[in-house]
Amino acid sequence: MNVGVKVREISTGSIGVIEKGNNQNGFFVNFGSRKNWKRNNEVEVIQNTIDNSNGKQSTTPKPIAQQQQQQQPPPQQSQQQPPQPLKPIPATRPVPTIPKVQSEDPGPRFGNFTLPTTNSSTKYSTLPSRQFFEVSSSPGDENGTFKRSAAPPPPSSLSSNQNGSNLNKVQSPSRPSIPSFEPPTQQPTQPLQKSPRNVPIVPKRTNPSPPSPPLQSPQPTPQQQPPPLKPIPQPQQQQQQQQQQQQQQQQQQQQQQQQQQQQQQPPPLKPIPQPQQSQPTQPIKSQIQIPITNTNGNTNGHSSLVEKSPRNNESTATTATTKDMWNIDYKELKFVGNEIGSGKYGSVSLGYWLGTPVAIKKLHENNEETEILVQRELQILKEIRHPQIVQFLGVSRNEKDEIHIITEFMDGGDLFDALIFGDIPLTWKEKLRISLDIAQSCRFLHARGILHRDLKSQNILLSTNRRAKLCDLGLARMFEERINKRYTCVGTEIWMAPEVCLDQSYSTAVDVFSFGIVLVEIITEKIPDERFPQHRFQFDAPAFLKKVPKECPPDFSKLCVDCTKYNPKERPSFIKVLDTIQNIYDSLPDDDEENYD
């Protein structure tokens, strides 16, 4: 190897210059971005920058591999077979790289990148040699690449030529030789001619030949023709098939359910033959049934009590039985004694219905207003079932078309008579128990969107064990608090809330105010004071506190004042009322008499 020889690395195409070094070989290749070549790689000499015309040879020490190669005798070659020349390397023009000055790094580098180093070697200078600058400044072609050297001579002349201008292969002394990376020569392939079915593919001839007629594929006979393939079902067809299968399954299930229902259903009764009438007659009022529906609105006229059944095979007798569920035959009622009470819309009498004691409420008038109230009360009572609300049993009409409402009988009378005219006074434990029953019934109604609007002591009935139940829901109505509406002034003025008397919009707070007036009756055992419009029907709390007995629990009287506040938003809800009364009731000692809890 000569110093200053320009070489190319075969594997990467990088251009470098051989320079003198202090390593084992005595020289190294400077590629600009790195020094020395990769291990087990080969370089190609492409230009010698030193003029050897005077016959002077470089005194650069040769690598050990090259010395061993010179000492060994040349291999014996056959005289009959001349040496084959080397194939030229494909004309690939390497891209010139800008040399960079850096310290020697004998280790391998991949990708032509370097790492910054701070310590420089003290063996020799880190500046590039003169030969490197001559190679980097040598002129190139128009594209800026170096000119390619002439083709290398045959291998026989490699041993005689020592100037480094021919191709030299330098191998690492410690590693075996690497096979040549030259791409193999490929002969141009010729396109194959497409052949018809059942005919082997034959390549075209290279020699020129006269044009031959095109090959014709043999027509298959009917016996040789393959059977037609079934069309692959498309996704839409699969979906349609699945839908059809699902529909068939649903139809089968429906048929099975119908068969089971027919087996379980008893045979229909034959309708009783009715005598034919020549002319239609109008129904008698006593035979008209009061409509009771599950809707919130009022029904006028003589509509059906129950909606039509979805079954088409339902008998007439079954439908008539369903319609008569809330209608009681007047002949089944038996009145006992005189009236036991009266109200604004009717009087109450004691009676028996099929041997059961009941309360029969007879309405005074039978007009449109009464009809609306009856329908409203029946609609509400029919859907309400609560231990602290009087149970509704049905409705009946007599021959005079008088409406009678039948409910359960409460043998203790109403709360007003027990407080004002009662012979046996109520203990504070019983008063709190009655107040708790009233609050529970009102809480139940409000949870279902129902206002009573006429809560007073006359509409609270007692049993013999001093338990209270709420009755007379004729003025109750369904409400929706989100709708700010003005309602008509109804109820009794002493127990009515100020917003109802002033014809303002109201909500559940009106029942809380009426409950507070009932607490005034329970605490004082007197009729509440009248409220006047000049004071905007406001409750006089100081006057009430003067009438409170000393035995009354303080929290009980305070709850009464809170429930009767003028501002509806300041009144407590029935949930809080229940908690307060329950705490007061638990704090009191038990009565000496029998505990009816």
UniProtKB/Swiss-Prot annotation:
Residues given in the record as ATP binding sites: I340, G341, S342, G343, K344, Y345, G346, S347, V348, K361
Any one Gene Ontology molecular-function term assigned to this protein's record: ATP binding
Source organism superkingdom: Eukaryota
InterPro entries: Actin_reg-Ser/Thr_kinase, Kinase-like_dom_sf, Prot_kinase_dom, Protein_kinase_ATP_BS, Ser-Thr/Tyr_kinase_cat_dom, Ser/Thr_kinase_AS
Parts forming coiled coils: none
Catalytic activity, reaction form: L-seryl-[protein] + ATP = O-phospho-L-seryl-[protein] + ADP + H(+); L-threonyl-[protein] + ATP = O-phospho-L-threonyl-[protein] + ADP + H(+)
Annotated Pro residues bias: 72-97, 208-234, 265-274
GO cellular component, one term: cytoplasm
Single biological process term from Gene Ontology: signal transduction
Biased composition (Low complexity): 157-168, 235-264, 275-301
Pfam families assigned to the protein according to its UniProt record, in alphabetical order: PK_Tyr_Ser-Thr
Cysteine pairs bridged by disulfides in the record: none
Catalytic residues in the record: D454 (proton acceptor)
Keywords, sorted A to Z: ATP-binding, Kinase, Nucleotide-binding, Serine/threonine-protein kinase, Transferase
Family: Belongs to the protein kinase superfamily. TKL Ser/Thr protein kinase family.
Record protein name field: Probable serine/threonine-protein kinase DDB_G0281745
Species whose genome carries this gene: Dictyostelium discoideum
Lineage: Eukaryota, Amoebozoa, Evosea, Eumycetozoa, Dictyostelia
